[in-house]
């Protein structure tokens, strides 16, 4: 069942929070920044993951905090090519591939609830 709500996604009782980002994102603005502020260790683990695994757009990376909150980072944008550059815009194919991976993750892990913003409509630049 899908229920549309408004408000601060960080206050959600959902088991999982998912959002769209770019590989090597610096989590400096938008929801990513709020997540970085709420779970600094997630950002540290994310940086390590990106440096060692070199993720591609259209995939995902999930993280679970000490409070059992799960954050799924959907790679909906191309990575910045050089240090200090902005990442590319989101594309519908990247969003679709990442959402398919999210569905597989939900099915395999038996997640019961998910909070998902309007993907890639802020920094990603897509229309809702």
Named regions from a protein language model:
Residues 1-128:
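Macrodomain-like recognition of ADP-ribose-binding/processing modules
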């Amino acid at each position: 069942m899908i229920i549309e709500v408004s408000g601060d996604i960080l206050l959600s009782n959902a088991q999982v929070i998912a959002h769209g980002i770019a590989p090597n994102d610096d989590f400096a603005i938008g929801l990513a920044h709020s997540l970085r502020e709420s779970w600094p260790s997630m950002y540290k683990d994310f940086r390590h993951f990106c440096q060692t695994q070199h993720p591609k757009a259209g995939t995902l990376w999930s993280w679970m905090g000490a409070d059992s909150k799960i954050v799924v980072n959907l790679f909906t944008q191309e990575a910045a090519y050089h240090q200090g550059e902005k990442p590319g815009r989101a594309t519908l194919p990247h969003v679709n591939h990442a959402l398919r991976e999210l569905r597989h993750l939900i099915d395999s892990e038996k997640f019961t609830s998910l909070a998902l913003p309007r993907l890639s409509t802020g920094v990603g630049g897509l229309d809702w």
